[in-house]
């Protein structure tokens, strides 16, 4: 690779957000503008909420510029076969991707070319291996751990792959346009991208956790289902014995969930939620008075399910709906512990934007 670098912004009409784009992709990057950069990797940050690299670019006059390259989370990239050694300090690369908003020297990586001609891809559609939107499972096979504890119509326990029918959790709620109330609209307008709790590695919680592409495991614990999400190693209990939340139950990011079966559908209702964001764009959730209803509708062969979430929140004049899917998988579903989230990149961004002092003062 030549050390002299040419980079140019290209209008790329019709390019969608990357399949593994992190929570705030739309707020940080221009989905319809791309750049091609060539240079040398001078720094690697292998941590969550997203992997980052620093690329040193040499211009026509010999001057250098540093660009920050961003990819998805460690878990998402590992699902595509990446490791910490995939890109190392000293590697010379040509990188293509979406550029940062407002002139920021950032690039969300779509593809990488090495000097030997080999390429690395970061998007689902570019990855090798089975199509994640197809079910790769065997009819009649048991995916549960041991005997079923309860006489439910369906045994939903075991591991599930959540990249099935997945989409980025930004601007994915229906209906459109978003039916914000006057209070909700004012709050949304005053929201800054850098207030995103996910960037600070805070618990994602509901309803955003529902939309994540990472795998989950469901365990029948008798009185309740225990749902373990790979995302931030998060456990969630869904009570199936009809209990109500105790009067002194504090609100939390996952709230208090109760469930029941309606035929082949597990129905979960959640209350007692903390205020938060509904998606990566910053749509607000009030928490107090918020009610979330989920339906996990199993297919006839029980190898996949459609998950539908309906959100009732005082900041909106109509219920909001989010749709995802889950599938069994014969090749195995990784439910191992996720690498811990590191907020270092969040504070670095605040420092570069001159907002760190403002943040520390709570302004």
Please report, for each region that a protein language model flagged, where it lies by residue.
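Bacterial N-terminal signal peptides
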Residues: 6-17
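PEST-like low-complexity, intrinsically disordered acidic/proline/serine-rich tracts
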Residues: 23-363
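Positively charged n-region of N-terminal signal peptides that target proteins for export
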Residues: 1-4
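Signal peptide processing junction and immediate N-terminal pro/mature segment
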Residues: 19-21
């Amino acid at each position: 690779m030549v050390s002299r670098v040419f980079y140019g912004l290209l209008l790329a009409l019709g390019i969608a957000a990357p399949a593994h784009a992190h929570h705030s992709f739309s707020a940080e990057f221009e989905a319809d503008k791309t750049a091609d950069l060539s240079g040398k990797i001078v720094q690697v940050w292998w941590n969550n909420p997203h992997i980052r690299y620093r690329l040193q670019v040499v211009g026509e006059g010999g001057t250098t510029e540093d660009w920050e390259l961003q990819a998805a989370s460690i878990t998402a990239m590992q699902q595509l076969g990446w490791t910490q050694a995939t890109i190392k300090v000293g590697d010379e690369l040509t990188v293509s991707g979406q550029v940062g908003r407002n002139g920021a020297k950032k690039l969300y990586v779509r593809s990488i070319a090495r000097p030997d001609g080999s390429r690395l891809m970061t998007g689902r559609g570019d990855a090798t291996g089975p199509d994640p939107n197809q079910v790769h499972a065997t009819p009649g096979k048991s995916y549960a751990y041991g005997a079923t504890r309860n006489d439910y119509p369906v045994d939903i326990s075991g591991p599930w792959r959540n990249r099935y029918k997945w989409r980025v959790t930004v601007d994915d709620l229906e209906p459109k346009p978003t039916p914000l109330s006057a209070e909700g609209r004012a709050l949304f307008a005053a929201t800054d991208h850098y207030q995103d709790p996910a960037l600070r590695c805070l618990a994602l919680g509901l309803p955003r956790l529902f939309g994540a592409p990472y795998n989950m495991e469901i365990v029948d614990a008798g009185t309740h289902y225990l749902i373990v999400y790979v995302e931030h190693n998060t456990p969630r209990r869904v009570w199936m014995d009809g209990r109500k939340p105790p009067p002194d139950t504090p609100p939390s990011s996952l709230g208090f969930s109760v469930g029941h079966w309606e035929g082949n559908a597990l129905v979960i209702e959640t209350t007692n939620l903390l205020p938060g964001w509904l998606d990566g764009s910053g749509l607000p959730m009030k928490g107090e008075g918020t009610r979330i209803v989920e339906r996990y509708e199993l297919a006839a062969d029980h190898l996949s399910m459609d998950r539908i979430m309906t959100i009732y929140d005082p900041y909106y004049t109509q219920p909001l709906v989010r749709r995802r899917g889950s599938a069994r998988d014969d090749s195995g579903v990784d439910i191992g512990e996720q690498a811990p989230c590191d907020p270092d990149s969040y504070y670095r961004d605040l420092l570069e934007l001159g907002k760190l002092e403002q943040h520390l003062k709570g302004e």
